[in-house]
A protein has these predicted regions:
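N-terminal export/targeting leaders of redox proteins
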Residues: 1-22, 100
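Short, functional N-terminal and low-complexity linear motifs
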Residues: 2, 32-38, 56-61
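Amphipathic alpha-helical interaction segments
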Residues: 11, 35-36, 63, 88
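Electrostatic cytochrome c docking/interface patches
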Residues: 12-27, 43, 63-65
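Generic hydrophobic secondary-structure packing signal
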Residues: 17-20, 36, 69, 91
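Periplasmic/extracellular electron-transfer cofactor-ligation site
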Residues: 25-51, 75-78, 97-100
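Extracytoplasmic electron-transfer domains, predominantly the class I c-type cytochrome c fold
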Residues: 49-100
Length: 100
């Protein structure tokens, strides 16, 4: 009985693991898209005002540099120190996916 319960519990956890992981797209929509745009182009009112980079075309930065800017901010971009390392990693991966 214990083995069956353990196996079932393990299967539930494994199948729902993605729900507990960081979701780069959701984080982007919540925290980044208002300036950087849904597609990373920066073609938003605030993005134009702040002259943000078009991440759908150019990404000349390392993952470590991107993570540092997300966590600590840079220039007019505010810091997101409250994000976990997993959240930051998911955001960096999502930014990479925006390049056309």
């Amino acid at each position: 009985m214990k083995l069956t319960t353990s196996v079932i519990l393990a299967m539930i956890i494994a199948s729902s693991g993605a729900a507990f992981g960081a979701d780069g797209a959701a984080l982007w929509a919540q925290s980044c898209a208002s300036c950087h745009g849904k597609d990373g182009s920066g073609n938003t009112t605030m993005g134009k005002k702040l002259a943000v980079k078009d991440y759908s075309k150019s990404q000349s930065f390392s993952d470590a540099e991107a993570a540092n800017v997300i966590k600590n901010g840079k220039g007019k971009m505010k810091a997101y120190k409250q994000l976990s390392d997993a959240d930051v990693k998911a955001l960096v991966a999502y930014v990479r996916s925006l390049k056309k």
